[in-house]
Regions:
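Conserved catalytic core of sirtuin-type NAD+-dependent deacylases
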Residues: 1-250
């Protein structure tokens, strides 16, 4: 069966669905010009991932911060990073009452910028900073990101980007929110993720066990494709999602 026929099938499933959940990974952001962390052209091919270990950040703060600022903030400030058509379709489906939430492994805030209001950020969000001492959070744009990491205006404590460093746990609200979303949906759309990062990679299986139809959009087969996926669509989500949307009944 070719992609065109499978797109029609996906559109039929999603048209009938009462509760769609999107599950996005690095491939979604790559279409907006953000390089992945792993694989060919990945960030960790150029930088030591230990720089994002939480213990390393505490023990070698200045060294760690230099890399964090360069990778996550200098890069983004020099690029015109914005939501791509795939992001926009997920936001459109929420507005139409079809999609209840997006579960994302990405930290770039693009789903919120696109217009989704219920986003479970499994790995946090780089657009915020959090105090490691008192937990106070601020918008990254309100800070001056100099050669020293920012300090908390409330208590003077060391701040860090509000995404998950190696050695930190998944935020409870994001984890339990993702589990509930997967349990309650009847259609689950996997987009741009290989399924290799734990524990996020367990979420699609929860949806499958609870009866959801699994639609997968990836550039190549993933760990899900031969095990839980009902319809596999190979290609860019920024092209496939609009094609599905155009065929959905309203």
């Amino acid at each position: 069966m070719n992609n065109e026929e499978k797109i029609k099938q996906a559109a039929e499933i999603l048209s009938k669905a009462k509760n769609i959940v999107g599950f996005t990974g690095a491939g979604t952001s790559a279409e907006s010009g953000i390089p992945p962390f792993r694989g060919e052209g990945g960030i960790w091919n150029q930088y030591d991932p230990n720089s994002l270990d939480i213990d390393f950040y505490y023990r070698h703060t200045k060294e760690s911060w230099k890399i964090i600022r360069e990778v996550f903030y200098n890069f983004f400030s020099n690029k015109d990073i914005k939501p791509n058509p795939g992001h926009l379709i997920l936001a459109k489906w929420e507005k139409e009452g079809r999609l209840s939430s997006v579960i994302t492994q990405n930290i770039d805030d693009l789903h919120t910028v696109a217009g989704n209001s219920v986003v479970y950020e499994f790995h946090g969000n780089m657009s915020r900073f959090v105090c490691t001492k008192c937990g106070h959070k601020v918008d990254a744009k309100s800070l001056t990101l100099s050669e020293e990491p920012p300090r908390c205006a409330q208590c003077g404590g060391l701040m860090k980007p509000d995404f998950i460093f190696f050695g930190e746990g998944i935020p409870e609200d994001a984890y339990y929110g993702s589990v509930r979303a997967a349990e309650n949906c009847d259609a689950f759309v996997i987009i741009g993720t290989s399924g290799q990062v734990s524990p996020a990679n367990m979420i699609p299986g929860i949806a499958k066990r609870n009866g959801a139809k699994i639609i997968e959009i990836n550039m190549e087969p993933s760990t899900y494709t031969n095990y839980i996926t009902d319809i596999y669509l190979e290609g860019k989500s920024g092209e496939i999602l609009p094609a599905i949307d155009a065929l959905m009944t309203r």
